[in-house]
């Protein structure tokens, strides 16, 4: 009965001690290797485990993984790894990862594998404890202080248990009281001893305005038979001891409380506490089995050692007076289910291209067919991180089509596998990264910009090419000789006839009164507007709408010549034309390309200002299409052209004498005589400011033509009229008038209603009668053949020079080209216009009258030098 009561009180005391130490009790901790241990298998032939030890314990002790099979324990060899595969290291430690491979093929659904860790050597300690010599009384409790006047009363209590059972009595204990300021250390604290359960503290013991702290502990009195140590209250003083194994636990102490408990504590190097766990084991007697003390309490320590505590029950101190206590390494482990911890081998990844798309293909390795699994694919740009990659979770497939990728970009992809359904595990390792580069494709924006640029460039090229081609064409066209470029025949020769150049003839010369005066007056105000309505080119002299029938071949008998000349007086006495009569359109040269040509009915075209003769043996007909390329000489004609420079170089011109028979109604007959050849006399009248050549009448019924030193570019062929010439013979040039009959060119009287005179035409070539040209070759005594007509120079009237002759009647006339202008053979662009002396007044009264009138007005007959042709026409342009 007494023993049962003692056991009951012992258990109550242990419960009370446990309540007092409750705030320090903690559960048994798992070590870092056990926390990080994870094992997975392929469920075929191996198990892979991953765990980590702390870096601090690495130099003190090595831990070994143990694999417990059904019939044996296998030590597993592990190697260092770069990282933990499936777990994380605790934040308070620095881990050293390890990886272990365990060959194993006996897998089944009921497997529950057990793993543990063992240090590389035995670790432990042992102590013999006599109870009477290891007594530590319990600490005081229920401590409180209260003011009492100017003193402070500190009170406490101690539970000594049943006096019948307990070895400890109030006579065996005393109390030690320590006090100090709050900021002071306990080593500097003041203390006092008392055997009472209270103490009165005087004010002189304290400093004013300070906070103090006090503590009490129980001590064994000096007269007690027990020995031991005081109760806990303050930390122990630490000092350095002799060198030793720091991984070994030390300072194992056990104290019997004198009642029913044995309190033990030990210290462990703090750096090893993360890797190794220790436990307290004891034997009540040497023959008793070893038991484990629990629970183990860890005291927080600021030093390099960590203190652990554990209390042992002492139910029968008398029966078991000596305990054997030891601290050993605790073996810890856990169970892992194999079919829930499967990790497969990583797949093998490849990539293929299908036209414009890309596909990923992979193959798995060593996967049982009955284990269902799934795949996870990640792909990204090579420059990006895997955190920004795109992830696709697929079923049990072995390929995946990638979406549209950016061109000319490097991509990376990887794949892994994981078991699902009845089996479980974790993802396998990622496969090797597969890298490829997509093909380069021109962006759509670039294509649009290039097309726009090409179109714009093409338009610019076409534009500038067109402009350049047009300019080149114009330059090329300007180099082609063309009569239309010449100002000689533009606007009817308006530029060659200044308004005041003919005023002297119209107002001062009595021989020009009447129709001729009106004719000259109209020259100053003549209008060329009618040229715009003409169907022929402005260079055409003859009106294409009204031409006359060409007369028959000229009769060389004197009668024919007389008949043609009988009409001249009629023309001279003709009155003015009524104003109601329509004015004849101003004719002009006809041209087409580089050729000049008059209507077919004329040997040379008429110039503006000359009237056609009355109809002689012909009627008006519609205009025949004139040759635009040729001017025909009269059939069978022997007319020749001689340059004036050559003619004038032979001597001075003879005076022109005209027979009085020219003024009668009868036609003057040309009597062939054995005299020197008759030459044509040419006269030139030049104005003061603008040189003007007086026209020479061709004697034809269709009018006459004016000429200058040059014509526009081309190869014109002048055509002589087929009708009889109405010219009279005059004196030969350069011969005395007494030795040869004179020829005087004479124009028919010009009606008042006829058009005004046009600009000067060809000037430096004259026509020689056949008799003149043949006289040089005729033998003496044989007269020259009679001439039908010959040009006669009549002063005061326009003169005409017959067109140049060709080697045959219809041959071409070759001109000399200088720049854009052509000149007659033998003349340059700066040739001076030749002229002759005025005719003798005794031979031609009209010429004499004109000379007198001109002499009064002081019009010199000496010619002024003409400007070069090119400069002349440039001056007309500007």
UniProtKB/Swiss-Prot annotation:
Chain positions of motif Box 1 motif = 476-484
Keywords assigned: Disulfide bond, Glycoprotein, Membrane, Phosphoprotein, Receptor, Repeat, Signal, Transmembrane, Transmembrane helix
Q: Which regions are flagged for Basic and acidic residues bias?
A: 671-689
Q: Do the record's keywords include Signal?
A: yes
Q: Where is this region: Disordered?
A: 223-244, 539-620, 660-709, 771-810, 829-849
Task: Please tell me which stretches of this chain the record labels as motif WSXWS motif.
Answer: 427-431
**Which loops or segments lie on the Extracellular side of the membrane, by the record?**
23-440
Cytoplasmic topological domain: 463-878
Q: Which GO terms describe its molecular function?
A: cytokine receptor activity
Entry keyword Signal: yes
What's the family?
Belongs to the type I cytokine receptor family. Type 4 subfamily.
Q: What does this protein do?
A: In mouse, there are two classes of high-affinity IL3 receptors. One contains this IL3-specific beta subunit and the other contains the beta subunit also shared by high-affinity IL5 and GM-CSF receptors.
Name of the protein: Interleukin-3 receptor class 2 subunit beta
Q: Which gene encodes it?
A: Csf2rb2
